[in-house]
Amino acid sequence: MVMENKFLFLGAPGVGKGTLAKQVANTTGLFHLSTGDIFRSVMQEQGALSQTLAHYMNQGLYVPDELTNQTFWHFVTTHQNELHKGFILDGYPRTLNQLEFLQSKLQLDQVFHLKLSDPQVLVARILNRLVCPSCGSVYNKQSKPPLKANQCDRCHATLQARNDDTEAVILKRLTLYEDTVKPLIEAFTKQGILTVIEAQLPLEQQVNLVQQLVH
């Protein structure tokens, strides 16, 4: 499959990776491909793949690499018209197995790793996070509060904090992320396609840095 402008955004939970990816997609016209959006789209289809995926998702189970790979590639091959100008991957690949599958199908042009030097800053961000259970919009009590307290700006549903957003759980998730992403970072570094972006920079500055490398 011939496709230009293939980019990946990496970052720990709560670092702002999704926000940056969406902003860059909006300014460049590239398609924003998040794992969650792909899963939700495929689950709405009729067929064995959607049923198998729903079995894991509806029970909150970990989706195996093989199924994740199959779901990702199914989405890509059935949305070629939307993706022909290029896309931004957000949340995939997460493991070496997923990376090996991806690179057997296509080659990434650039990888951006959004990184926070101080993990306590990230902990504070996540502890202040509010999520809309209806449309998935994400807010922050300090840096991105909703217009009306505890109400989603888009669909007006009541915002919620995640039950597992505690400092101990967050630090555990960060450690797990670092262990999981380390071999990916090493692989992308060897390939010469990794760019590290400091997550404490203002969003506009992050976008400008990315746009210098995204054509």
Curated annotation (Swiss-Prot):
Taxonomy, superkingdom: Bacteria
GO CC term, one of those recorded: cytoplasm
Record's subcellular location: Cytoplasm
Annotated EC: 2.7.4.3
CDD domains, per database record: ADK
Protein residues bound to AMP: 35, 40, 61-63, 91-94, 98, 162, 173
Name of the protein in its database record: Adenylate kinase
Lineage: Bacteria, Bacillati, Mycoplasmatota, Mycoplasmoidales, Mycoplasmoidaceae
Gene name as annotated: adk
